[in-house]
């Protein structure tokens, strides 16, 4: 009984809060990777209101570019027309994913929104040394960085000087029965 009450309260709070969050990330409706699976599970099990704009996906470079451009334009429209959106939660990785996400970080900050950058990239340390000043400047524009483990949190604390850093482990399987959100 207590679990049901807690789930009900969490669902109410989450419905109210989740309507203020705009998520940016890869195509996730038919997940083919870790980030897509996390986003799919967020929509299905965690957030009652899942405002999401897809910024990557496609089978060739032209399709990928068009997806990024259309995602950027859609985000600008949402931020212009929906004053309820307070937080932009951007899922990213390394290399091209991070470069693409940097544009979305800049746009969100231009509209005065809080930015949560959720970094999934296992190769981020290798990527960081390719352009540390620019990458650090993007990271430091964010209000919060979400990492997947304590070791990643410690790493990001050494290369940033501003954003809060939090750990949120990936959810890759549906929650157990009984306290489903």
Q: PLM ranges: what are they?
A:
Residues 92-97, 113-130, 144:
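A short, histidine- and acid-enriched strand-loop-helix "catalytic/donor-clamping" loop
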Residues 71, 87-111:
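An aromatic- and histidine-rich active-site surface loop
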Residues 2-58, 112:
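N-terminal subdomain of nucleotide-sugar transferases
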Residues 81, 137-138:
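Structural alpha-helical scaffold elements that stabilize or flank donor/cofactor-binding regions
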Residues 140-178:
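Donor nucleotide-sugar binding/catalytic pocket of nucleotide-sugar-dependent glycosyltransferases
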Residues 66-79:
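Glycine-rich, highly charged phosphate/nucleotide-binding loops
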Residues 22-24, 178-181:
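Conserved donor-binding/catalytic core segment of Leloir-type glycosyltransferases
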Residues 111-114, 163:
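A short helix->loop->beta-strand "cap" motif at the edges of active sites that frequently abuts
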């Amino acid at each position: 009984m207590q679990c049901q009450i807690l789930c009900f309260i969490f669902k109410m709070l989450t419905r109210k809060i989740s309507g203020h969050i705009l998520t940016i990330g890869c195509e996730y409706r038919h997940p083919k990777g870790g980030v897509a699976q996390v986003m799919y599970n967020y929509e299905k099990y965690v957030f009652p209101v899942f405002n999401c704009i897809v910024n990557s996906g496609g089978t060739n470079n032209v399709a990928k570019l068009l997806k990024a451009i259309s995602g950027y334009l859609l985000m600008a429209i949402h931020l212009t027309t929906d004053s309820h959106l307070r937080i932009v939660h951007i899922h990213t990785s390394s290399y091209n994913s991070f470069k693409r996400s940097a544009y979305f970080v800049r746009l969100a900050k231009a509209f005065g929104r809080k930015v949560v950058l959720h970094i999934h990239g296992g190769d981020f340390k290798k990527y960081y040394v390719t352009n540390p000043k620019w990458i650090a400047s993007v990271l430091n524009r964010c209000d919060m960085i979400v990492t997947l483990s304590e070791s990643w949190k410690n790493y990001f604390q050494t290369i940033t000087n501003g954003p809060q850093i939090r750990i949120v482990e990936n959810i890759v399987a549906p929650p157990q029965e009984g306290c489903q959100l």
